[in-house]
């Protein structure tokens, strides 16, 4: 997901012990659009190093957890005045960051975290380069600290290139763990992973981590679309034909799975409603346009996005959430998302019956929306890659 900001960019690598920090400096030449919302610092006393995910623990403690790409997770109390955060997990020595799209990318708490203390992470490791889904457990002595010795590797998927790793992991309303994997990288999906259901790449997976099969750390739900009756197909696949679904989320009211898929060189950035067994087109199509071949492609059996935009609005979509909080009632039921490169945030209204309606909320060239998150009350937060966590407020007249 974390494409380099354009049009003028400089990359500086700072080596500090085992850590490598990639700082992307840029200058954009873009017309500033009028915004109906503004940013405000959610936790003005806290800063982070390249935050890429924000989650809350489902244990009633009203804590938030911010994932730093370098390999650390910080825990802190969800209060604007908070000044203290705790290192919940530090796996920088295991995380590989050879490219700006690698690192520690995702965090998911088990639905019964309060009882079992389990949480899961998605990161890139090296030798061989691979995506790792691992489980850890909360320390029995300190709820603000994880027990590193509890690590259990659930799944590993080899990555042929450094980019398009996906990174989001989410427990669905059914209790299964959903995992986003990009097409394996390079450009244009040279190995056609998006349309190859024998590989896990280019897909969203669905696995059961509570009832592992013999010899595995998970099982495949019997109602997965390729479970048990498709020779050669990877049974873990829930949906496929995706390029790099960096961020996805479930609407807690409707149960819909919303995914934002980062585009190629056209580029077309797209939003999909992910459904079981559906093929979302990549690399036959990019969004609603033919990609391979560029003209006259066969669209039969492909599911097109509910919304897309092109390079005049941004070049790297960051998926968000359907807003179900109470602070901003005018956003209720709308999908809030953004673009990492242009600094735009939008709301998308879609009921499944009528065409989606999109509206600009904010255009801030100083915002780097790498991810979104929600707290226990479904209030929305925005992770900016420059180290700050924001929330929205209505713009002053």
Located regions from the model:
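Acidic, glycine-rich loop-and-beta core segments that form the ion-binding/anion-interacting portion
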Residues: 235-276
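Beta-strand initiation motifs
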Residues: 32-40, 80-86, 138-152, 213-233, ...
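Beta-propeller blade signature
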Residues: 133-141, 193-209, 273-275
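N-terminal Sec-pathway targeting helices
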Residues: 1-14
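Short, conserved, GDST-rich strand-edge loop motifs in beta-rich repeat architectures
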Residues: 180-200, 267-270
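Conserved blade-ending motifs and adjacent loop-strand segments that build the rim/top face
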Residues: 242, 354-376
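Surface-exposed loop and turn segments in beta-propeller and other repeat-based domains
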Residues: 86-100, 149-166, 211-238, 282-312
């Amino acid at each position: 997901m974390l494409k380099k900001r354009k049009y003028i960019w400089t990359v500086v690598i700072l080596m500090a012990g085992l850590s490598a920090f990639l700082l992307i400096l840029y200058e954009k030449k873009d017309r500033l659009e009028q915004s109906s919302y503004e940013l405000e610092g959610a936790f003005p006393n806290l800063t982070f190093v390249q935050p890429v995910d924000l989650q809350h623990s489902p244990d009633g403690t009203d804590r938030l957890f911010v994932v730093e790409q370098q390999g650390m997770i910080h825990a802190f109390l969800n209060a604007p005045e908070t000044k203290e955060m705790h290192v919940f997990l530090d796996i920088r020595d295991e995380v590989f960051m050879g490219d700006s799209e690698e690192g520690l990318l995702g965090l998911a708490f088990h639905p019964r975290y309060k009882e079992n203390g389990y949480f899961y992470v998605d990161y890139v490791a090296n030798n061989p380069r691979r995506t790792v889904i691992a489980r850890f457990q909360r320390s029995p002595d300190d709820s603000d600290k994880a027990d590193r010795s509890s690590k259990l590797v659930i799944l590993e998927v080899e990555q042929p290139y450094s980019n398009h790793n996906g990174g989001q992991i989410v427990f669905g309303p059914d209790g299964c763990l959903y995992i986003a994997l990009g097409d394996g990288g390079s450009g244009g999906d040279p190995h056609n992973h998006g349309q190859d259901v024998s590989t896990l790449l280019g897909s969203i997976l669905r696995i059961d981590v509570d009832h592992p099969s013999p010899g595995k750390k998970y099982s495949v739900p019997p109602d997965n679309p390729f479970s048990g009756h498709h020779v050669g197909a990877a049974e873990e696949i829930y949906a496929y034909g995706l390029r790099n679904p960096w961020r996805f989320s479930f609407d807690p009211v409707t149960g819909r799975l919303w995914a934002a898929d980062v585009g190629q060189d056209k580029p077309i950035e797209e939003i999909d409603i992910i459904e079981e067994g559906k093929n979302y087109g990549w690399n036959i199509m990019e969004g609603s346009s033919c990609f391979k071949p560029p003209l006259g492609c066969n669209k039969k059996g492909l599911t097109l996005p509910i919304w897309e935009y092109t390079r005049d609005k941004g070049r790297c979509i960051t998926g968000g959430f359907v807003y179900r909080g109470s602070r901003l009632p005018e956003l209720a039921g709308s999908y809030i998302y953004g673009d990492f490169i242009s600094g735009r945030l939008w709301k998308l209204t879609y009921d499944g019956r009528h065409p989606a309606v999109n509206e600009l909320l904010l255009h801030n060239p100083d915002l780097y929306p790498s991810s979104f998150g929600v707290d226990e009350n479904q209030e929305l937060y925005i992770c900016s890659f420059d180290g700050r966590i924001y929330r929205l407020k209505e713009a002053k007249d």
